[in-house]
Amino acid sequence: MPDFHFELVSPERLVFAGAVESVVVPGTEGQFTVLKDHAPLMTTLKPGVIDIAESKALLHRFFVRGGFAEVSPAGLTILAEQAIPLESLDAARIDADIKDAEEDIADASVDETRRLAAEKRDQLLELKAALKI
């Protein structure tokens, strides 16, 4: 299968760059797959999992927390709000972090502190839902 160039970029770093066969992307209007010579496209992403196939045998999976995707003749670029390799995630740790965030919401005496704790909890719930754990 022909390859195309793909880059996954988070605010911290270039997460992945290279020639790939396909990338499955969680678009806000639905999941879509990009192959070589895909029509140009610019879209937003919802929290979800990106599947990157370098070859039939080599698959990379990342959780992304929203962002933008651009398909051009040069390839696919994803600018993600956050990108985490799936193998680095632990379901028990995510559940514990959700519980901690909910306790922080209950304990907060200032609206701003409560809002930040709720935002953290919501991000963790999105992660859990995207991973279906």
Curated annotation (Swiss-Prot):
Major localisation: membrane
CDD domains in the record: F1-ATPase_delta
Domain of life the protein comes from: Bacteria
Topology class, membrane: Peripheral membrane protein
Quaternary structure and interacting proteins, as annotated: F-type ATPases have 2 components, CF(1) - the catalytic core - and CF(0) - the membrane proton channel. CF(1) has five subunits: alpha(3), beta(3), gamma(1), delta(1), epsilon(1). CF(0) has three main subunits: a, b and c.
Family classification: Belongs to the ATPase epsilon chain family.
HAMAP family: ATP_synth_epsil_bac (MF_00530)
NCBIfam families: ATP_synt_epsi, PRK00571.2-4, PRK13449.1
Protein name (Swiss-Prot/TrEMBL): ATP synthase epsilon chain
Organism: Methylocella silvestris (strain DSM 15510 / CIP 108128 / LMG 27833 / NCIMB 13906 / BL2)
